[in-house]
Amino acid sequence: MKNIVLILLVLFSFNIMAQNKEPFKIYKDSTISSYNAILTSCKDADFVFFGEDHDSPIAHWLEYELLTDLYQVKKEELIVGAEMFEADNQLILNEYLEDKIDDKKFQEEARLWPNYKTDYKPLIKFCKDSSVQFVATNIPRRYASIVSKKGFEILDSLSSEAKSYIARLPINYNDSVGCYKEMLVDMGKEHATPNIAKAQAIKDATMAYFILKNYKKGNLFLHYNGSFHSDKHDGIVRYLIAEKKKVKVVVITTVSQEDISKIEDDNKNLGDFIICVTENMTRTY
């Protein structure tokens, strides 16, 4: 009996210690918040941008939880989209969602990210099983690539079909403000390549374009993207608001910190909610 009590005391002590090793905290306005606060805010939104670290298991878990919980509230009014799927793959994505092709064929023919099976397949499967519309919002990477080499002008030479997978041209671009300015500054004067920022902008503009193209009043559009694309309500959000001003947008962003007991100054204003993950967290790939 004494041995059992001793074991229970050891296990209890270990459990208390483990509870102090928190993998993440959620912040809003520099103060501790919660997942329920995120969910409550998102329920009334028109657009929700979940900015992820692409290899963060915490971000991907919360992405799935938010999807399933918002579906319980919005049902057929919920639309989902993601940076990880390119616009010219919309047909094959629809064919898979509508059971016209199987999972094996979809994975063979769609250009999927390396972490699709672990991180994005659960989202796709839920939308498939629940008949939720899923929009491939990103520009085909080959077009972003040529912009990074030759600038926006090269897009004018594309066919009408190719242009149908891109935001309407010309896009409004200013590299002296916002995230594109920051990108060029981070590169440094010696290594700054203006066309790299332009490639980022054409991605953001295209994602905003396809989000708005599929959105109808009363919908809630939940979009998954790398955090850089929506941090500080910039990037995709800037292009979206330029076209549709009187809407409620919620931005969630993911950051990593060594110490998550308080939010670092550089991370405070990145989003409406900040998911602050410990740097020791394992990665999905």
PLM regions with names:
Residues 43-78, 84:
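N-terminal, post-signal-peptide region of Sec/Tat-exported proteins
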Residues 78, 91-214:
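A substrate-binding/cap region within the structured catalytic cores of diverse enzymes
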Residues 78-85, 250-255:
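Short internal beta-strands
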Residues 206-215, 219-222, 229-285:
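C-terminal regions of proteins
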